[in-house]
Amino acid sequence: MENIKFTSKGITCSAWYIPTTSNKYKSSRGNPCIIMGNGFGGTKDTGLLHFAEPFSKAGFDTFIFDYRSFGDSGGFPRQNVSYKNQREDYHAAIEAVRSLPNVDRNRIALWGTSYSGGHVMVVAAQDKKISAVVSMNPATDGLAALTQICRYGGLKQLTVAVGHGLKDLAYSMFSKKPHLIPIVGQPGTAAMISTPGAEAGYKSMAGPTWRNEVCARTALEVARNRPITFANQILCPLLVQVGSNDQVAPPDAARKSADLASGQVELLEYPIDHFDFYSGSWQEKLLNDQINFLEKTLTPKQA
């Protein structure tokens, strides 16, 4: 595993590059590479190696990065989840990977989960050279997410989140320190994610650089983050993995996004909740499904 630095909008971002030791999918131009960013508030040391290392063993290079203001990357304010910035960071990571000497720049796949499961759809819609996309338990429609929050937490939950967001926005206007709220917490708390079981599920995979706090202003952005509106512009093969019991990322929105995509689409559904994707037998199952999809889409074409 190599430590890599790249820049996004002038800010230094940190990444891990894991070259495969296999020649299974190698072409004269190099190996295919999978670019991976984490979900809401996640860092590269939080659960991603459970996917990246099997990808590497299967024959794919992997590139895992921290978004600006998270983990080992630079950027201020710290812990600021901006879907626009994170999409830009994906684009910057793509350019960094395309410059790596042993990577086939024509066989790059994007992998995303939860919040980044939506990011990769948008980025692939914008960059037509992307070869494939894996979108796992994706958050594809912020409006649907707000509706779901009201369903499990009531209107009060949404009102509290907006109140914290406005407070943080006011702080930013007067150059005060950010107003932070938890990323994940128990039901009824002010955390951004507070569905039953979410706190235990998220914290079980937390890495050393992960912090359970986020700038509250992101609560004001959620409704505007709508990757579903880009879905019909996705031309490359797309794998969408949906949890039919997902309480965090609305499954109906993910299904609709898959239906709207213009290229080859595989929509796979599992009878699980959001954080069941990251461990246990279901993680093994859906990981195998991802590898099968990537084998089909990243195998070099015969001359």
Task: List where the protein language model places each region.
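Catalytic nucleophile-loop/oxyanion-hole region of alpha/beta-hydrolase
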Residues: 43-47, 70-105, 109, 281, ...
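Catalytic active-site module of serine/aspartate enzymes centered on a nucleophile-bearing elbow/loop
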Residues: 268-303
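The serine-hydrolase catalytic nucleophile loop
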Residues: 40-53, 67, 252
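Conserved alpha/beta-hydrolase
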Residues: 54-74
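Conserved alpha/beta-hydrolase "acid-adjacent" motif
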Residues: 247-253
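Alpha/beta-hydrolase-fold enzymes
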Residues: 121-204
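N-terminal cap/lid segment of alpha/beta-hydrolase-fold proteins
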Residues: 1-30, 83, 279-280
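Short beta-strand/loop motif that positions the catalytic acidic residue
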Residues: 234, 240-242, 246
